[in-house]
Design a protein with these regions (language model features):
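Solvent-exposed functional surfaces
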Residues: 1-203
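Intrinsically disordered, low-complexity N-proximal targeting/linker segments that flank membranes
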Residues: 169-254
Length: 255
């Protein structure tokens, strides 16, 4: 049933009408605890981030464990103890319970809508401005880490998530070997806290040379899926800028 909850959530993110199909054709699931938790998707119109099954499992796993590889999740569900390299029944049960809670956190209406408000609030109002679902996956996992662990003030959560997402897109932080990069960042966050980790990453990657040379060179490319260009457009949306040669049409309207 948990597997179906993941599958149905992914399907409903794309096709809200599928809810009625589930109600009519899957009586067992319709009577489960998960059905009413998906009911809000009947009216969902979100298109910026439509997570697939792998994305849902990845986000659920990452914010519940200090790990990021889905292969590790498979091992844990098989009962593997990474320290002793033995297989234990209690690990299977504990992993399933944590994964279930993780999935419930991911599909929770308030969590998902508040996360999307943060992303949209940063200027990313369309899927046209998103070229890295991996960056969104980590940003959502980070959001869930912050709201569940409550390590930072609630009023700061969205700002931190926005900064992390923009930084990761601008620098291509998760463009290659994303699971290894996820694990590294989760480890740093657990060791130093998210605020200090973010400050260190900013200091290490967003230097004057980055802004004066790398960004300028990236903007010289003509590709419309260039990450730097997409962040530039999002910044214009954020600032409510007018489009070129227009006195009343905003960039937001044209995207």
């Amino acid at each position: 049933t948990l597997r179906k909850a993941v599958d149905y959530f992914a399907h409903l993110c794309i096709d809200a009408s599928f809810y009625d199909f589930i109600a009519e054709h899957d009586a067992e699931f319709a009577q489960s605890e998960y059905m009413h938790k998906l009911a809000w998707l009947k009216h969902d119109k979100e298109t910026v981030y439509d997570p697939e099954c792998d994305d849902i499992l990845r986000v659920a796993f990452m914010h519940m464990y200090p790990r990021a590889k889905l292969s590790d999740l498979v091992s844990l569900l098989s009962g593997r103890d990474f320290e002793t390299r033995e297989y234990k029944t209690e690990i299977i049960e504990d992993t399933y319970d944590k994964l279930k809670q993780g999935v419930l956190n991911v599909i929770n209406q308030n969590n998902f809508t508040q996360f999307m408000l943060a992303i949209r609030g940063a200027g990313f109002i369309s899927s046209k401005l998103v070229n890295s679902k991996m960056a969104l996956d980590f940003a959502y996992a980070l959001y869930l880490m912050l709201v569940t662990k409550k390590d930072v003030n609630v009023s700061e959560v969205k700002r931190i998530v926005q900064k992390w997402y923009v930084l990761s897109v601008l620098t291509g932080r998760y463009s290659s070997s994303p699971e290894s990069a996820f694990y590294r960042d989760i480890k740093l966050i657990n060791e130093m806290g998210v605020v200090k980790t973010l400050e260190n990453i900013e200091a290490a990657t967003l230097s004057e040379n980055f802004w004066n040379v790398a960004v300028v060179q990236d903007l010289a490319y003509t590709s419309t899926i260039n990450p730097t260009y997409l962040v530039y457009l999002a910044a214009q949306v954020y600032n409510n800028d007018l489009s070129l040669l227009s006195h009343n049409i905003t960039v937001r309207y044209l995207i």
